[in-house]
Amino acid sequence: MMQTVLAKIVADKAIWVEARKQQQPLASFQNEVQPSTRHFYDALQGARTAFILECKKASPSKGVIRDDFDPARIAAIYKHYASAISVLTDEKYFQGSFNFLPIVSQIAPQPILCKDFIIDPYQIYLARYYQADACLLMLSVLDDDQYRQLAAVAHSLEMGVLTEVSNEEEQERAIALGAKVVGINNRDLRDLSIDLNRTRELAPKLGHNVTVISESGINTYAQVRELSHFANGFLIGSALMAHDDLHAAVRRVLLGENKVCGLTRGQDAKAAYDAGAIYGGLIFVATSPRCVNVEQAQEVMAAAPLQYVGVFRNHDIADVVDKAKVLSLAAVQLHGNEEQLYIDTLREALPAHVAIWKALSVGETLPAREFQHVDKYVLDNGQGGSGQRFDWSLLNGQSLGNVLLAGGLGADNCVEAAQTGCAGLDFNSAVESQPGIKDARLLASVFQTLRAY
């Protein structure tokens, strides 16, 4: 099926190119085209895994992905995380535009990749005129002579080339053609299915001189950690564009869905957010040394745009609902022996957007995670706040996409904890100088360690 879709896209692209040449002839702007000064190849080098983050409004497989598509706003967020930024410029199938390129380039200092079905040198001159620093060349669309001609034009303008392959034959061609950066598309061009094994199979054959980028189907930190053994970097678009909170979406993939719990001071919330946390925990349990009241919680929340989670233990349901509403909490976390009836009643009473998390104590065995209306589980040793870890080998083979791991997590063990495959980690006592007082250096160290791949 997809070969015909791809053939149709390319046929339509040829028509588009001819029309654009009439509307904006090469002679009308070629003298204004300056070589790029942002080096795509260099940007993807270095010890850490590279990320090409993509501005994408729609796609043939998903339709419109982001309704409020604002390239300036997206670039202002991506610039904090990306090695390079990809911009879809295909109009018919991806609702892209060449006009997006200068908008993104003006806001973000990274190299900008023009992502399109490029079949004519004209498109490369056009991309550079609109401030692109690199372009995509797809071996599924181009023969070797076309590729050489187009790559030569790009390099003459000091632009980089992302050479895309999707099977072994194209991978061998990429090597023979001397491609410096090869993108392995995990999407099957025939049926649009995703197979991450494609990266595992093709990457080792590309050799050490080639920078390998894994494309399509990457949407979790666990996938990134595992595939970073095969690829030098990742191109990620749809997994980010589908989320309203773009900062959180990027952090979720680069670092995991991590929470810093037991916040009592605004400066600690800011340090947690600056380090890379998504969630901030506010404890309303009177026996905790980190307990806060509503006024203190409001002070903490005003300091940083974390998604705040209220922590309760066997509280009266009306009290939980009241605090969730007054503070506009993202979630409530239940740390006592709340049963299904309590959870059902709470779900009825809470605003629909407030999630319910349930903390479970892990002893010799892993407790069942079978509650209705529970969105996430926090697995901890004991009742929480003990600073001790349980036997993580119990997590082997478990489906952990809605689980946060807690208990004594710090810079010394966070990587091992992340490798359990949990969606995220819950930090508390090991990032403190004393109970309730977070240490900004310890927080920074934890998140730098999580990003050291």
Curated annotation (Swiss-Prot):
<feature type="region of interest" description="Indole-3-glycerol phosphate synthase">
    <location>
        <begin position="1"/>
        <end position="257"/>
    </location>
</feature>
<dbReference type="InterPro" id="IPR011060">
    <property type="entry name" value="RibuloseP-bd_barrel"/>
</dbReference>
<comment type="function">
    <text>Bifunctional enzyme that catalyzes two sequential steps of tryptophan biosynthetic pathway. The first reaction is catalyzed by the isomerase, coded by the TrpF domain; the second reaction is catalyzed by the synthase, coded by the TrpC domain.</text>
</comment>
<dbReference type="InterPro" id="IPR013798">
    <property type="entry name" value="Indole-3-glycerol_P_synth_dom"/>
</dbReference>
<keyword id="KW-0822">Tryptophan biosynthesis</keyword>
<feature type="region of interest" description="N-(5'-phosphoribosyl)anthranilate isomerase">
    <location>
        <begin position="258"/>
        <end position="453"/>
    </location>
</feature>
<keyword id="KW-0413">Isomerase</keyword>
<dbReference type="InterPro" id="IPR001468">
    <property type="entry name" value="Indole-3-GlycerolPSynthase_CS"/>
</dbReference>
<dbReference type="Pfam" id="PF00697">
    <property type="entry name" value="PRAI"/>
</dbReference>
<dbReference type="InterPro" id="IPR013785">
    <property type="entry name" value="Aldolase_TIM"/>
</dbReference>
<protein>
    <recommendedName>
        <fullName>Tryptophan biosynthesis protein TrpCF</fullName>
        <ecNumber>4.1.1.48</ecNumber>
        <ecNumber>5.3.1.24</ecNumber>
    </recommendedName>
</protein>
<keyword id="KW-0511">Multifunctional enzyme</keyword>
<dbReference type="Pfam" id="PF00218">
    <property type="entry name" value="IGPS"/>
</dbReference>
<comment type="similarity">
    <text>In the C-terminal section; belongs to the TrpF family.</text>
</comment>
<keyword id="KW-0210">Decarboxylase</keyword>
<dbReference type="GO" id="GO:0004640">
    <property type="term" value="F:phosphoribosylanthranilate isomerase activity"/>
</dbReference>
<dbReference type="GO" id="GO:0000162">
    <property type="term" value="P:L-tryptophan biosynthetic process"/>
</dbReference>
<dbReference type="InterPro" id="IPR001240">
    <property type="entry name" value="PRAI_dom"/>
</dbReference>
<keyword id="KW-0028">Amino-acid biosynthesis</keyword>
<dbReference type="InterPro" id="IPR045186">
    <property type="entry name" value="Indole-3-glycerol_P_synth"/>
</dbReference>
<keyword id="KW-0057">Aromatic amino acid biosynthesis</keyword>
<comment type="similarity">
    <text>In the N-terminal section; belongs to the TrpC family.</text>
</comment>
<dbReference type="GO" id="GO:0004425">
    <property type="term" value="F:indole-3-glycerol-phosphate synthase activity"/>
</dbReference>
<keyword id="KW-0456">Lyase</keyword>
<comment type="subunit">
    <text>Monomer.</text>
</comment>
<comment type="pathway">
    <text>Amino-acid biosynthesis; L-tryptophan biosynthesis; L-tryptophan from chorismate: step 3/5.</text>
</comment>
<comment type="pathway">
    <text>Amino-acid biosynthesis; L-tryptophan biosynthesis; L-tryptophan from chorismate: step 4/5.</text>
</comment>
